[in-house]
Regions:
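Aromatic "clamp/platform" in nucleotide-sugar-dependent glycosyltransferases that forms part
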Residues: 112
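A charged, aromatic-enriched C-terminal amphipathic alpha-helix characteristic of glycosyltransferases
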Residues: 168-192
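Nucleotide-activated donor-binding/catalytic signature segment of Leloir-type glycosyltransferases, i.e.
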Residues: 74-92
């Protein structure tokens, strides 16, 4: 019998569990973290952010990572008049990645092509609700996320806005998403 074995995550170390989650009651943080390349769909994240900021200005956007589209994304944010709400901290690794997840209210992975994509699982482990593209492989095993087509910037913007303004939805996906990902371990995948 043949079956697909999806990726999983290791339980968070105590060091990463102990990273504090800041209070963002006044201002929300929405994050893209990954390679800033065409495959990852960063332009859709910037365009969705532009739509969100037409409805609410108490939201900041972070595009963490590096890649050949970095300069173009900085320019696109400036062209859309949202550069003051955008941060580009560059490449992250190790503990920095988990600090970014814990400091975020929403994680967005708008990938055009993504065989799996482990980042949403890592974000959800940290209690950060995630929005993923329907075209990502991890969407096959994740239910406690919001899924949109990568090209549908209006649906992505609506999802971001909803998570930033609806505490009940945020709390549900925060708690249930963490439970779901905590059950996707390498041990359980190996027992299949």
């Amino acid at each position: 019998k043949v079956f697909a074995m999806h990726n999983a995550v290791y339980p968070l170390s105590q060091e990463y569990q102990d990273i504090p989650r800041p209070d963002h009651s006044k201002e929300k943080i929405v994050t893209f973290l990954g390679r800033i390349t065409m495959q990852k769909g960063p332009e859709y994240f910037v365009e969705a952010a532009s739509l969100v900021l037409q409805r609410a200005r108490n939201i900041r956007f972070v595009m963490a990572g590096s890649g050949d589209m970095m300069d173009a994304m900085i320019n696109l944010a400036a062209e859309r008049g949202i550069a003051d709400r955008f941060h580009f901290p560059g490449f992250m690794k190790g503990k920095q990645v988990y600090e970014v997840y814990k400091n975020s209210d929403v994680f967005v992975m708008p990938s055009v092509s993504e065989p799996f994509g482990i980042a949403p699982l890592e974000a959800m482990q940290c209690g950060t609700p995630s929005i993923i593209s329907k075209q990502s492989g991890c969407g096959e095993i994740l239910d406690k996320v919001i899924k949109t087509d990568y090209w549908d910037i209006h649906a992505m913007a609506d999802a971001i806005y909803s998570l930033c303004t609806n505490p009940a939805l945020f709390q549900y996906l925060q708690e249930e998403g963490k439970k779901e990902v905590d059950g996707i371990t390498w041990e359980k995948v190996g027992l299949r």
